[in-house]
Amino acid sequence: MGRLEKFRFYRQNDDNNTTVQKALLKAQKQVASWKVELDELSPKILSHYQPFSELSANPVKRKSEPNQVLQSLQTLINNFQTSDFQAIATQADALWLQIKHHDSATGYESWITDDRGMDKIDNLKRFFEDNEQQFIQQTQTFVVQLGNYNKALMALTNEKVSFTTTDLSQPLASSYNPLFKRILLSLLVFFISSLVGLVVLLTLLFTSL
């Protein structure tokens, strides 16, 4: 193999290295950006998500806060395209197969030792393997996080549907609410105590005349 062919081979490997590095870096930036969005949404979900029994006691919250969280989550999920990751993975696989093809090409073994080409191939192989593992781990972690948020979204959607289909003509504070029972009992005791005190006071006034 002539020097010109060797130079072209090295240049092609360098181009492959740069292309995959840029592709993986772009994917890592996308994952990091989506993680920031998820981290920002997490406290909103925890602060705004309330069970139906609690939302029913506040007619203002039930119309505003759940809708805002739903819209934010839906926007994020709509923007998340797994095809972006699949395209990058396909491109990396194609480039890796191309390198394997060069490794087994005719005449390659005759000059690889003298020109230390094997070191370049090994370095490139390690680069692919390290970045591939890092990319897979980050993607798997993000998919798990996205699945958890999907579960939260479904739970919040079910609560919203359950509330909107409930007969709102009934009192919001029902007899099934323990807090309402305690408040009602306290008011009743206070009313009875006040009434007894008033009767005693009137009795004392009449007897003193």
UniProtKB/Swiss-Prot annotation:
Cellular compartments annotated: Membrane
Main location group: membrane
Regions crossing the membrane: 183-203
One GO CC term, this protein: membrane
Membrane topology listed for this record: Single-pass membrane protein
Source organism, top-level taxon: Bacteria
Keywords: Membrane, Transmembrane, Transmembrane helix
The protein, known as: Uncharacterized protein MG331 homolog
Organism: Mycoplasma pneumoniae (strain ATCC 29342 / M129 / Subtype 1)
